[in-house]
Amino acid sequence: MALSAQQIPRWFNSVKLRSLINAAQLTKRFTRPARTLLHGFSAQPQISSDNCFLQWGFKTYRTSSLWNSSQSTSSSSQENNSAQSSLLPSMNEQSQKTQNISSFDSELFLEELDELPPLSPMQPISEEEAIQIIADPPLPPASFTLRDYVDHSETLQKLVLLGVDLSKIEKHPEAANLLLRLDFEKDIKQMLLFLKDVGIEDNQLGAFLTKNHAIFSEDLENLKTRVAYLHSKNFSKADVAQMVRKAPFLLNFSVERLDNRLGFFQKELELSVKKTRDLVVRLPRLLTGSLEPVKENMKVYRLELGFKHNEIQHMITRIPKMLTANKMKLTETFDFVHNVMSIPHHIIVKFPQVFNTRLFKVKERHLFLTYLGRAQYDPAKPNYISLDKLVSIPDEIFCEEIAKASVQDFEKFLKTL
């Protein structure tokens, strides 16, 4: 068993003490050269106790210095052998036998060190040893936040560097547990390379993964198949990149679902293939969101607001958000524009962006123009004001070019409302 860092000094002192004792015994017994001592030390008078320790040190912690020491000891042994070559042959033979037995004893001593049991955890230690102990903080068995695991997880650390907001992911326990089980090199690296190939920039990866953390549970080959399907429908690489950025969950849907969604909009709206493709590129969440708001709004335009089918087609291709807009907002905006401002359907169809504007902004500007006597929305009459200019330009230009008044006058009027 290998010795721990705390056990080395203690074993070093004990072995060194034993080597000194054996060295003393060695001196007394030198007159009997054929006899050897236990614990791996040979009966050669010219080998000091320090050399003996370095030569037969810890088996587990052998280093280059130990090897050099053993080499120097070997050279000393060779000098001794040459010096004793003039002695009787029996003395040389006895010396060789002694060295062989000593090497065998050293092997036994090393094996004995290896088999020594570790120190007991209840054994007292000094203050210096206690200070040197560095204990890692324990991994919490359970937690409500991923912050407790960041120091222990390389995956979480690298996701944070990418800009992933773990505080949002931890609100979904299943997703948080999934991240803790993932290996960055095996499970996440290839996914990041795939997303970059699709068109997600480095500075967009953090926000994308924060929103669509479920993509890590998707099979990479399935994701590639879905991208290939979009390309087969003549969506360019730039189109796919734009769609994935605007609708991060797009790639989580199967090819069958994507195909059904494209077919629904082409059939329901009676659009051409190109117009259907342009529609979903501008608003890709049409492929990922619920179809119920779309179906409901189509009924509202036809039955409640009174638009014709071709008029609906024109408006939604201009402003795709009209398909998913809030029903109440649509009806309130139409009621004010059509019934209060007296703007007919055919003019509203030409400027459908009015449905994408905050209603209070339309009301404020219309009431200010009415106060000034300039609320004229009939293109056949002079001083005509289009809906486009009414809702799209900033206050400074509206006051200067449309209302022919100052911004201060407009602000004073708003205080009276």
Curated annotation (Swiss-Prot):
Which body tissues produce this protein?
Highly expressed in heart, liver, kidney and testis. Detected at lower levels in brain, spleen and lung.
Chief location category: mitochondrion
Write out the annotated subcellular location. Answer: Mitochondrion
* Region feature Disordered, mapped onto this chain: 69-96
Annotated GO biological process: mitochondrial ribosome assembly; mitochondrial transcription; negative regulation of DNA-templated transcription
One GO molecular function term of this record is: transcription cis-regulatory region binding
Which keywords does this chain's UniProt record carry? DNA-binding, Mitochondrion, Ribosome biogenesis, Transcription, Transcription regulation, Transit peptide
GO cellular component terms, semicolon-separated: cytosol; mitochondrial matrix; mitochondrial outer membrane; mitochondrion
Q: Where is the composition biased (Low complexity)?
A: 69-88
Give first and last residue of the transit peptide.
Answer: 1-68
Query: Which Gene3D superfamilies is this protein grouped with?
Result: Transcription termination factor 3, mitochondrial
Family note: Belongs to the mTERF family.
Q: What is known of its domains?
A: Contains seven structural repeats of about 35 residues, where each repeat contains three helices. The repeats form a superhelical structure with a solenoid shape.
Report the function annotation for this chain. Binds promoter DNA and regulates initiation of transcription. Required for normal mitochondrial transcription and translation, and for normal assembly of mitochondrial respiratory complexes. Required for normal mitochondrial function. Maintains 16S rRNA levels and functions in mitochondrial ribosome assembly by regulating the biogenesis of the 39S ribosomal subunit.
- What name does UniProt use for this protein? Transcription termination factor 3, mitochondrial
Please tell me the species this chain comes from. Answer: Homo sapiens
